[in-house]
A protein has these predicted regions:
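N-terminal "arm"/small-domain region of PLP-dependent enzymes with the aminotransferase-like
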Residues: 1-7
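Phosphate-binding glycine-rich loop
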Residues: 10-52, 66-68, 76
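Residues at alpha-helix termini
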Residues: 19-20, 70, 98, 129
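A short beta-strand submotif of the Rossmann-like class I SAM-dependent methyltransferase core
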Residues: 29-32, 55, 104-108
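Short, well-ordered alpha-helical microsegments
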Residues: 36-38, 61-64, 115-119
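Conserved PLP-anchoring active-site segment centered on the Schiff-base-forming lysine
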Residues: 40-100
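Active-site phosphate-binding strand-loop segment of PLP-dependent enzymes
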Residues: 83-135
Length: 135
């Protein structure tokens, strides 16, 4: 069974790499998104140290647990009533402590709704802050 699973993951990595022009070694298939988030946040903390992850207030514990388990701090942002996602305007004016370092931002598409303008703005803000965008 383990050999079959390993072979399946190898084939999946090859297919994903082929479709995206990347390397198979770049892909880390996981069973659930929260497991992938855990891998990402562990890596962020190992490279950047202590800090926070900006996430939206309207979410579930399975989206916050990987942040906490990795040793980072969740920093909650207000959501927009029209998108149910992070309200970028409020994040832009959110006061940060002088020693607070935002290492990542979570872009959650609540109910599968994607607001392209807000997504672009949040991605740009993450870049300006030097934060990893986790979508």
């Amino acid at each position: 069974m383990e050999e079959t699973t390993a072979r399946g993951f190898a084939e999946l990595r090859e297919a994903l790499a082929s479709r995206t022009g990347t390397w198979p070694e770049d892909w880390f298939p996981v069973f659930k998104a929260r497991y992938g988030m855990q891998v990402a946040f562990d890596a962020v903390r190992s490279v950047r140290g202590d800090g926070s992850v900006l996430t939206q207030l309207f979410t579930c514990c399975t989206a916050v647990d990987p942040i906490v388990v990795s040793g980072l701090r969740p920093r909650y942002a207000d959501v927009g009533a029209d998108t149910m996602g992070i309200d970028v305007a409020k994040v832009e004016s959110m006061p940060l402590g002088s020693d607070e370092q935002v290492h990542a931002m979570v872009m959650q598409h609540t109910f599968g709704a994607i607001d392209e303008d807000s997504s672009r703005r949040l991605a740009a803000l993450a870049g300006e802050m030097g934060a990893l965008l986790v979508e």
